[in-house]
Amino acid sequence: MRDQSHYGSKTLDEICAALVERATEFGVEIFDFQSNHEGALIDFIQAQTAGADGIIINPGALTHYGLSLMDALIDAKLPVVEVHLSDIHSREEFRQKSVIEPMARKQISGHGWQGYIEALDLLVEELK
């Protein structure tokens, strides 16, 4: 179980359900995927790029050192929004650097699960 003081109490399934509900309001479809393994994330991005219009990603600890993940996101040539449940900029120093942020359209950090909704709203607006 993740530390609720940093990450809130909503489960990943609940967050995904909220995203699907919001996506339905916009008439768009989302595909969700979770892995603790960088290679699996890269494989998913590479496999889904052709059918996608944008990427919302919470890279977790890969935020700080996931250069292969960053390269896959760059190679996808899609707009990317980086999301973090906690405010990584107010946490330990090692958590404050993101290798993903420079290539992302935006980083949303510290808005809890609602950050995912904000990311979807941003992508839908940008892709209109």
Feature names for model-found ranges:
Residues G60-T63, S86-I88:
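Short glycine-rich anion-binding loops that position phosphate/pyrophosphate groups of nucleotides
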Residues A47, G66-A76:
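Short Gly/Thr/Asp-enriched flexible loops that form oxyanion-binding sites at enzyme active sites
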Residues E29-D32, V81, S90-K128:
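Short, glycine-/small-residue-rich phosphate/pyrophosphate-handling segment
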Residues Q48-I55:
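Short acidic/histidine-rich motifs immediately flanking catalytic phosphotransfer sites
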